[in-house]
A protein has these predicted regions:
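Hydrophobic/aromatic-rich alpha-helical bundle segments in the mid-to-C-terminal region
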Residues: 103-118, 122-126, 130-133, 141-192, ...
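Short coil/turn segments at alpha/beta junctions that flank glycine-rich nucleotide-binding fingerprints
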Residues: 26-30, 82, 146-147
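Short alpha-helical functional segments enriched in proximate histidine and acidic residues
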Residues: 23, 70, 74, 78, ...
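Amphipathic alpha-helical interface segments
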Residues: 19, 23, 96, 164-171
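Amphipathic, non-transmembrane alpha-helical scaffold segments
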Residues: 9, 17, 60, 64, ...
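N-terminal intrinsically disordered/low-complexity leader segments
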Residues: 1-11, 201
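Hydrophobic alpha-helical connector segments
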Residues: 62, 73-105, 157-161, 187
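Helix-turn-helix
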Residues: 12-15, 19-58, 62
């Protein structure tokens, strides 16, 4: 195992990325300063430029892309391991999403993106689509091809499903505790409602 300067530098950079990802996820781009990240890691804020010369924006883009890549890989594994039926696949999607810190896509679009360069905002928008919406859309289109779901606006349904699952994070702990069901069970029920509809059968 390497213990030289390069390994130490790599470990330090990884700590910076981990701290930045956590803080940006909690507070958004505007709510985090380089001093906050440096304090979390235990270094001077000027030392951050050694690891990310582009400063706060470069750091935000890098850790957001890293977070999204983890979603893309995780959703792919979840769907692949769920079997061929759409309900099981979407339940697996919900389980993966709820196992990760919430993305807060609405805040990202309306608060974070306007504060960074347009090219970087577009880059993150494309990454978010590829990592979050495209995998769910692929599940629904596969189900359409097998005759499990009707040929509707599946892209819209994918976005709605993602938003529904993310909204489960907003349910207060007290409500979850008194409801007698977990967030996972609540997300599964939302998916079942989406698939089965509210009309009586």
């Amino acid at each position: 195992m390497a213990h030289g300067p390069a390994a130490v530098d790599s470990d330090a950079r990884e700590r910076v990325l981990d701290a930045a990802e956590r803080l940006f996820a909690e507070r958004g781009y505007v709510g985090v300063t380089l001093r906050d990240i440096a304090a979390e890691v235990g270094i001077r804020h000027t030392s951050l430029y050694h690891h990310v010369p582009g400063g706060k924006e470069e750091l935000f883009v890098e850790v957001t892309e890293r977070h999204l890549a983890r979603h893309r890989e995780g959703l792919g594994r979840a769907v692949a391991g769920a079997g061929p039926e759409v309900r099981a696949q979407l339940h697996a999607v919900a389980d993966w999403l709820l196992s990760q810190p919430p993305m807060d896509i609405v805040r990202m679009i309306y608060s974070d993106m306007p504060k960074i360069a347009p090219a970087q905002a577009e880059r993150l928008s494309m990454a978010a689509f590829a990592s979050l919406l495209a995998p769910i859309d692929a599940v629904l289109r596969g189900a359409e091809g097998r005759g499990e779901v009707a040929p509707r606006n599946l892209g819209l349904a994918a976005g709605g499903l993602l938003a529904m699952v993310e909204s489960v994070y907003a349910i207060p702990e007290g409500v979850i505790a008194t409801s007698g069901r977990s967030r996972r069970e609540a997300a599964h029920e939302l998916i079942d409602i989406l698939l089965d509809g509210l009309y009586p059968r």
